[in-house]
Structures are given as structure tokens and as C-alpha cells.
Design a protein with these regions (language model features):
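Non-catalytic C-terminal accessory domains or segments of carbohydrate-active enzymes
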Residues: 1-176
Length: 176
């Protein structure tokens, strides 16, 4: 249960941020919030302006690429999630020569929260290296059903899509 004058922060990749307060609250300090009062609780929601961020992707080869974000990309968001849709064995991400994230391919997009690297990414970008996936990989049986990979040319390494997903936030103070 929240105390009066408690500060609350909510985060979401959706532009409509929602929270439920129990017991019901009489007011919150932010005027942009909508409150739907129920008998025992309150539904609180904020609507944020959507942000679209297009990363610049430079391909060095099918296995190596670099991502840069536009100036001010981190403004008005809580975080930016880089979503990398690829097929391969493993992926590694580097900033200034230091590995900051890695991933074993599992059939879903690789997601990396970028906020903690914001300054370095804005200055130098982030570098990615993908390794080929071969037919004898022991974990192929664990990949999602229906995922069919073409090993007729040997290893598979394919970058399908890169997108930036903004994470929004709202901070408010409640009172009973």
C-alpha cells in the first residue's frame, strides 16, 4: 500500500501508461493523468506522444554491422530497446572495443536496453558481430517448432531487421 505523497514511476513500451492504486486515491499531482475511480481502487493512465527513432545501420559484411542513433534519441524516453531480428549461432555487441551484450540464437529477437550506454552510443555507435549457425549445432532441437533453416550452403547467418523500441515513463505523486 502506498503512503500519501508517495512518488510512483511507471514504464512501458506502450504510449498509454497504466497503473492501479489500492486503496482508491482522491488526487494525484500531475494534471495530464486520467483517474478512473472504482469503489476500492483507482485506475490511473497517462498518454504519451509516440516517438519514432530510425537507427542508422552500416553493414560491413553479412556478419558485421554498426548501429548509430540520431542526436537526441534518448530525449523524452525512459530507455531505448534495440531489437535485432537475426538468424545465426551467437551475436556479440561492442562499444569502444568492450563487449557489452551477447546472445545465443533462440528464434526470437535479441533485445538490448541502451540507456546505460547512451553517451558512448551517441559518440561512437555500437558494433555487432554475428556467428554462423551450422546444421550440427546441438541446440537446434530447442528452437521453436516450425522454424525451418536452410543449411544447403553451409552455415546460416542473416540479419533480418533492426528496430528501436522506445520505453516511456510517467512519474506522479498520489494522495488519499
Amino acid at each position: 500500500m502506498l503512503q500519501e505523497d508517495a512518488k510512483v514511476r511507471i514504464q512501458s513500451t506502450d504510449t498509454i501508461l497504466k497503473a492501479v492504486a489500492f486503496p482508491a486515491v482522491r488526487f494525484i499531482t500531475e494534471t495530464s493523468a486520467k483517474i478512473n475511480k472504482k469503489k476500492y481502487y483507482s485506475e490511473i493512465s497517462f498518454t504519451k506522444e509516440g516517438v519514432h527513432i530510425s537507427p542508422e545501420v552500416y553493414m560491413a559484411s553479412e556478419r558485421r554491422f554498426q548501429v548509430h542513433l540520431p542526436e537526441g534519441a534518448f530525449r523524452d524516453v525512459s530507455d531505448l530497446i534495440l531489437s535485432i531480428d537475426y538468424i545465426g549461432d551467437t551475436g556479440a555487441a561492442f562499444i569502444n572495443g568492450e563487449m557489452v551484450a551477447d546472445n545465443f540464437y533462440h528464434g526470437s529477437s535479441w533485445r538490448i536496453g541502451l540507456k546505460r550506454y547512451a553517451e558512448a552510443i551517441q559518440n561512437d555507435g555500437i558494433y555487432f558481430y554475428l556467428q554462423q549457425l551450422f546444421a550440427d549445432a546441438t541446440y537446434l532441437q530447442d528452437l521453436p517448432e516450425g522454424l525451418r533453416l536452410d543449411f544447403s550452403k553451409g552455415g546460416v547467418c542473416q540479419l533480418n531487421k533492426i528496430q528501436v523500441i522506445p520505453e516511456y515513463y510517467a512519474t506522479f505523486t498520489i494522495g488519499d
